[in-house]
Amino acid sequence: MAPVQAADEMYDSNPHPDRRQLVSNGFEVNLPDQVEVIVRDLPDPSKVKEERTRLMGYWFVHWFDGKLFHLRIKAGGPNVDGEHRAIRTAEHPWLLRARLDDALEEALPKYAAVKKRPFTFLAQKDELIDAAATAAGLSHRLLNSFKVIPRFALSPKIYEPVDGTTRVGVFVTIGMRYDIEASLRDLLEAGIDLRGMYVVRRKRQPGERGLLGRVRAISDDMVQLFEETDLASVNVNDAKLEGSKENFTRCLSALLGHNYKKLLNALDDQEAGYRTGPRFDDAVRRMGEFLAKKPIRLADNINAQVGDRIVFSNEGQARNVRLAPKVEYVFDRTGAKSAEYAWRGLSQFGPFDRPSFANRSPRILVVYPSSTQGKVENFLSAFRDGMGSNYSGFSKGFVDLMGLTKVEFVMCPVEVSSADRNGAHTKYNSAIEDKLAGAGEVHAGIVVLFEDHARLPDDRNPYIHTKSLLLTLGVPTQQVRMPTVLLEPKSLQYTLQNFSIATYAKLNGTPWTVNHDKAINDELVVGMGLAELSGSRTEKRQRFVGITTVFAGDGSYLLGNVSKECEYEGYSDAIRESMTGILRELKKRNNWRPGDTVRVVFHAHRPLKRVDVASIVFECTREIGSDQNIQMAFVTVSHDHPFVLIDRSERGLEAYKGSTARKGVFAPPRGAISRVGRLTRLLAVNSPQLIKRANTPLPTPLLVSLHPDSTFKDVDYLAEQALKFTSLSWRSTLPAATPVTIFYSERIAELLGRLKSIPNWSSANLNIKLKWSRWFL
């Protein structure tokens, strides 16, 4: 972890935001002013596929708002009935934007599509494993069957630099395609244990699913599978390992031994040639020049021409770039105690709820391998009492820092060795049950694990099993691995900062909040998440759980809720029931009075297809707040988009003291906000000060999108609020990559998915005793 002093230099804003230009990764596409189409009514979109197949090659077919639009691609073919119209591109940009998705592939016939929409293809000359192995001086007969190839995606998107002026751009993104071509038999003969690894079809036919399942065993010429998608066994020549980073790591570390790290570092250098700021910017420039060489044919006598780079600026009528005010961390209810940096403020003022925190003498269960007792006791002493003045990063200790009276550790040794990989979870749970039988009430748990145990599958993982047991008893837990316990003091002091914050939050404490708008009576920010529960990746039938986290406008955590498990068809009803109950409880708790102005902001990461969650929660809010003046906003906050922002004025920082390498070059400052459309903003939440390595890829911004039915429509306010909520993660002193409304929901979903595999697990207590706890941190 970087020293806390480095965090104190964050969020420079140079140059002045009004003059700032942010270069995008896209190019404007010049299109005809209008096109001739045939339009007919088609209320049922399920019939589009049939029509598209019938007209393929002659007509481009696009469904929009209950109507089917036909654009002639070439003469001949089947006839089309409907109304002939001339439509203006500026008013209907979605038609040619959709056509561009197909036309880009047709314009680049030398590149085979690995994905149709957006058109995605692989570099033809560059393969990075071979280059990395050469740079590292490594060789192995199977290395050339491991491939890492740059992958380009071209995404046509509509953007609106000024209200009423819509344009279409093509945005370039670059990823990496990992592939393992080696035969399973060769890998097996090289000593690689393939059991449990995912395999895919070596040759995939149209309409076939690529994933086959996981390897149970290989005998004769057959691969025996479990968690299979279809067949329980396949011929060994028809399958290959999935090109995942996990499979790469398992295979290459086995093949290369201690030299694997050398290859990994060299591969990191190779990938940086495409993904760090200046290199990415140059790759995008070259792609734009390539695309601009000739027109892109859209239809009969209709072409598109790739033009200039799209730049967001504040020139002319456009006001597309601004810098949000710095986030202030707040440590009391009046707002008088505030600081620019979380740890500095916490050290100076103590936690936000220090005067009202109820449990000043918490009892914490500590579960640990008995052979590590001395080392664990030293760690606990440093955590509780501090490390002294020589280690200013954690000199005080948890008790003084949080204003507690004392902390009592209830020690629970477990007779287990790191070599015990099958029965460790049983021994942990048995030790806990024996200890708690006569230990009295405990308020939190610390579970210490050997590194080997922490990496075990969930069905044998001691941490997941102990978490299941203790959560059922209403006790939140914190995991600590032995390498963390054994850290050198100069590193341990910063780790203990994060550990103390998360532990206090799990005890229902509030370390800090943020400054917020106090002009209204009440403001709630509601995070909405979704957990898809299944036994494995290959299981077809899914069950869903709605996850809700509720915060006050200042970021105070109010409560969490996990809905009942349901089938896909019942998800709408489950959300309606859950949200109505939550809002009714908060209305009573916050004492909403008739005539009060109450703002409710919903954050979602990825709305479920064919379920209009926004309409459901708006309906619930109107019902519960019928006596109040309700302002509602439904905001989607996502990293899943093709937009990148580049600040060419940013020269970056030294990667480390005395280094000539620089990190964060071309990264926009934290809080830079760029308009993409009337209801959309790009929000930079990273910065050179938060980037750790010179090879770290240029960070992508968050896309903040406001639902058009929202009654509160200040998108810039909502983008700033999303920024503030990235500063509310109580897992670290540093901001998170996403707002905690999203981050916490994702964390809960991940843990629910893992806990699902534990026998007798029940989430009931999460809505009762742990309703106000951040048990998931």
From Swiss-Prot:
It comes from Cereibacter sphaeroides (strain ATCC 17025 / ATH 2.4.3). Changing G529D: Does not reconstitute DNA cleavage. Changing K506A: 10-fold reduction in plasmid silencing, strongly impairs gRNA binding. One of its GO terms (biological process) is clearance of foreign intracellular DNA. A catalytically inactive argonaute protein. Binds 5'-phosphorylated RNA as the guide (gRNA) and short DNA as target DNA (tDNA); does not bind other nucleic acid combinations, does not bind tDNA alone. Has highest affinity for gRNA that begins with 5'-phospho-U and poor affinity for gRNA with 5'-OH. Upon expression in E.coli, plasmid sequences are found in RsAgo, its induction leads to plasmid degradation and suppression of genes encoded on foreign plasmids, suggesting it may also interfere with transcription. Does not interact with preformed gRNA:tDNA duplexes. Residues 510-777 are annotated as: PIWI domain. Residues 445-757 form the Piwi domain. This is Protein argonaute. GO terms for molecular function: DNA binding; metal ion binding; RNA binding. Has 4 domains (N-terminal, PAZ, Mid and PIWI). The N-terminal and PAZ domains are joined by linker L1, the PAZ and Mid domains are joined by linker L2. The domains assemble in 2 lobes; the PAZ lobe consists of the N-terminal, L1, PAZ and L2 domains, while the PIWI lobe has the Mid and PIWI domains. The PIWI domain assumes an RNase H fold but in this bacteria does not have catalytic activities. The gRNA:tDNA duplex lies between the 2 lobes. Mg(2+) binds at L777. Changing E746D: Does not reconstitute DNA cleavage. Mg(2+) contributes to binding the 5'-end of the gRNA. Residues 1-107 are annotated as: N-terminal domain.
